[in-house]
Amino acid sequence: MHYVNVTDNQSSVMRLGGLATCKVLKDAGLTPIFQLTCRDRNRIALQSDLLSAAMLGIDNILCLTGDHTKLGDHPQAKPVFDLDSVSLLHAASLLETGKDLGGNELVGEPPKFAKGAVVSPCSDSIDAQLVKMERKVQAGAEFFQTQAVFEPEKFIKFMEAAKQFGKPVQVGVIIPKSAGMGKFMNNNVA
């Protein structure tokens, strides 16, 4: 294992914060990828969390829009979605230049991130995913992770088309441990 993904209240279910988890993993000698979603925080809080991550030496980030709160364990919570995954990537890239989204100069050394994004290679429209991938590359994505791949033929076709971007793609593979786990994923994972 080279990296450990640390989710951001995955499936809109409240859990321990990702930044604290990343710090614990880093202190244990692991390399975390800090996932940030736009669902729960506005642009001020997202930029603050990015700077906090950099201060703690957590430089691998995965920028996601996030699942709607209606899907989770607090469906009455108000989603934020001030930014989306592309604008969050742009914000991280801008912070690396020493400025924030408000045009303000940062104090001290600008952060440096390995910026990642998500792509869904098995969606109905590969072309739409390639357009999204291109927008994410233009915003600063340096690597991609796929959503779980269950259709190898679609994945192979997608990967052929995605070569044009020259970015590494980490494949999402989920191996159900039981039939019950498979049923749970089918019914509960967004």
Label for each model-derived stretch:
Residues A91-Q138, E142-F144:
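Active-site/ligand-binding-proximal alpha/beta "capping" segment
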Residues S12-V24, N42-S48, H68-N104, I126-A128, ...:
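Active-site-adjacent beta->alpha loops and helix N-cap segments on the catalytic face
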Residues H2-V6, P32-L36, I61-C63, K115-V119, ...:
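Hydrophobic faces of well-ordered beta-strands that scaffold small-molecule active sites
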Residues L19-G29, L50-I58, E105-G108, E134-V137, ...:
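Acidic (Asp/Glu)-rich catalytic clusters
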Residues F34-C38, N42-T69:
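A generic, well-ordered mixed alpha/beta core segment in the N-terminal half of proteins
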Residues G172-A190:
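Catalytic-face loop-and-helix region of soluble metabolic enzyme cores
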Residues Q10, P32-I44, F113-A128:
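Active-site mouth loops of central-metabolism enzymes
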Residues D8-N9, T37-R39, T65-H68, V149, ...:
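Short, ordered loop/turn segments at secondary-structure junctions
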